[in-house]
Amino acid sequence: MTRSWVGSLIAGTCLLLEVASLASSQQAPAPGVAEEIVLDAQASTRPFPHYWEQVFGSGRAILSLRDSYRRDLRTMKAATDIHYVRFHAIFDDEVGVYSEDAQGRPTYNWSYVDQIYDGLLDNGVRPFVEMSFMPRALAASDKPHAFWYHPLPSPPANYGKWEDLVYNFARHLVDRYGVTEVSQWYFEVWNEPNIDFWTGQPAQATYFELYDHAARAIKRADPRLRVGGPASAQAAWIPDMIAHSTQAKAPLDFVSTHVYGNDLSKDIFGTDENIDRSEMVGRAVQKVANQVKSSARPDLPIIWSEYNASYKNEIDVTDAAFMGPWLANNIRLCDGLTTAMSYWTFSDVFEEQGVIKTPFYGGYGLIAEGNVPKAAFNAFVMLHRLGDRRSQPDLRNSLVTKRSDGSFAIAIWNYAAEGTAGATRSVQVKVTGWQGTPRYHIEILDNDHGSALTAWRAMGSPESPTREQYEQLRRTASATQKLDDTSSFMLPAPGLALVEVRPH
């Protein structure tokens, strides 16, 4: 929650932000691009829900039992507005939920399921339940996926037994936690069935069969539970999903899909257009919003249950200060177009490619091995302090927000492509119409402030840091640049600044 400040802004004040060159006598990086942005505090505002910090992905279900996972989760909970966690493989054999006796009769075991979900709830977080992958005893094929833990992307050998598994799973959760609690969860059927996480043929038709059985089972457990899909990769299948559920009268309480900044235009839009990483997510979100709006279910909630700047391991992307302006820009682009967006992932307690060998390798997580916050984590912490109302939505490189106490929080960013450094911008914030003198607090994230990756490289990029080095990395990770009682600052590229303005 945003800390309340004493006093409030005087009604009818104007806020003017000018981006201009600073005096040549100041010790600063080379002068950057001069730009002027005028912000009017009297402009109308609209609600600005923090849709980007309510759901986060993580490594597969069984990893949530580890102390390191739960430590990272507590770190997230203390710094953001995280409400839900989504992970793969709650039905994987290592969770032990399903087996059959010699006569083929199902046996269910919810021991690890209970420990997994208890661990989330004990830390103030609810499950976003992705129902995957297929238990070996129920799978039509035992050919595994290439992931290190070898999940089975197979259809069930018996769809009736699949439906019974989902029903008994959901019914157990209702019995254990109560329907008042579980009705606030989300149940999502499978993961990315349009690519290699689903081997049914034809893929879409067999997925819809899987979905229909699961959705009926969820509603049979209790009609108040929420179920949706298709959890597709590459923003795919949304119109088909809505059309199918309408025709088949299959329950559908939300639609979900995924996008990554380095997805290809041909996969998202069916074109050869070269779309920059900074724009891909926003473009895909707009596409799906338009599809839902023009469908038979125009008011369906849209949940992006995975997104990130990269689906590959790119150290100068997900581990770097690049993520600050990338995230802020995507918040700007996607505002008003989605119910929630789930960043993949909050932690590098993650083993899809195997056991982590080094803390920085381009992992998806906001928190590196050893509970070391990355620059992207710091960006989420800063953006958490934005207000709950927004004005001036036409601005390209800033978000102007107003808080309930009347203060302002402004995110300003300077984007540069991954692995590059752009021109530094000089920024001056001016406030007019105040009774008295405004006070400023400015926080800046860039390659030299708040980037544990930079500190790790300065150590010589140790593959296995010592305990002392990990402690040093944790200290450095939180060392963003902080400025008080000044309205001027230099913003490197890549860089993200949060400017907080309040009465003196």
What are these regions (language model features)?
Residues W304-G422:
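Aromatic/acidic polysaccharide-binding cleft in carbohydrate-active enzymes
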Residues S8-A20:
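Bacterial N-terminal signal peptides
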Residues V55, L120, F169, F187, ...:
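Conserved, mostly hydrophobic/aromatic
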Residues R396-A452, A493-E500:
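Carbohydrate-binding surface patches
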Residues W434-S487:
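Acidic, Ser/Thr/Pro-rich beta/coil linker or hinge segments at domain junctions
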Residues T80-D276, K287:
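Substrate-binding cleft and catalytic face of glycoside hydrolase catalytic domains
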Residues Q27-Y84, R216-K219:
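N-terminal carbohydrate-binding accessory modules
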Residues N262-I315, T339-D348, R385, R390:
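Glycoside hydrolase catalytic-domain groove-lining segments
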